[in-house]
Amino acid sequence: MSNPVQELPLQSPSFLSFIKQFAALLVLGFVLHSAHADDSLDDEGERRARTAGASLIGQPGPVAVLETIEGKKIDLAELYGKKPVYLKFWATWCVPCRQQMPGFEQLQQTMGDRVQVIAVNTGFSDDIESIRAYRKEHQLTMPIMIDDGSLAADLNLRVTPQHVVIGRDGRISHIGHLDDQALHAALERAVSEQTAPASRSETSTAPETPQFAVGDTVTDLSIETLDGRQVQLGKGDKPRALVFFAPWCESYLEESRPETSQACLRVRKDVDNLMGQSDMEWLGVSSGLWVSASDLQDYKNTTPTALPLVLDEQDELFRAFAIRDIPTVVLLDAQGRVANILKPQDSNLVAAVKALR
């Protein structure tokens, strides 16, 4: 069988038309593939949000006094019984958050007089300057607060964005990832309902996690590595290093947060070099934000690192050491005391480890 392309003169109208049609098909294929990938990620985000939030549906909302970036206090418990509450967790580096922001502001404009809308920045590898610039860029008018991790713990944050609707009765009625019909229906129901509020004694908060600063001795903290090994922090006869990170840091933040991405790469390489040069026990502690056990295992299988990994699914270890930025390295001495906490901008990990010996 002859090849129809070979039979067309290279400069003929028929050949040029064929090339244009073929190029259009390639572009269409790329667009459809990208759209399918985006849809798959959206669906996975929704699944994770709903799975993590399933146990909270129908439960009383958290008791918390939120402080906006302007210093205004919002007492959630005082709103229960008077007005529904819509909390949206987000981050400036989050791509789907950016995509949803126009719709989020539109909801504030159309429902803000009937629903207390609050933009809850996760406070995870973010800063006030970036948040203020983001607010200006997207012309956001709802109150914005920065979480210290406690509200995320109360509401089982697993993805960004994550939507939480609390009805007029003070009970959680919707948790999801998508700005979809289910979210809008939940908001409409919350506005129209006339049920009695849950009592303040019923409202719930996650158990407080003890926090340790430099000089403190770590107690009552145990972790389990991906391979099932139990480690009791604060006990042992040798120093330990806890490397707080997320497996998506290097790749996902490469464009939106290049400094953070490079810091994660630098720390990973430094740790790999140091692991063979010291008698310290090294542990990589991954955040549970957008990370499951299988995600972390995939990272271990595809990344050249020998670092034993731990999934901090509910970010309890992150809260225990007040970690809000990745990468952060916590050094414990042989007596279980916090000797040093190195932030992302600290590039003296090698010297800090030598000083601990």
Protein language model annotation of sequence segments:
Residues 1-18:
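N-terminal secretory signal peptides that target proteins for export/translocation
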Residues 22-31:
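Bacterial N-terminal signal peptides
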Residues 35-37:
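Boundary at the C-terminal end of the N-terminal hydrophobic targeting segment
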Residues 41-77, 181-185, 189-233:
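N-terminal "domain-start" segment that seeds a small globular fold
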Residues 86-87, 117, 163, 241-242, ...:
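Hydrophobic beta-strand anchors of alpha/beta hydrolase catalytic cores
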Residues 89-106, 244-269:
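Conserved redox-active cysteine motifs that mediate thiol-disulfide chemistry
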Residues 132-168, 283, 294-332:
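Short, internal strand/loop/helix patches
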Residues 167-217, 331-357:
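Thiol-/selenol-based redox modules, centered on thioredoxin-like
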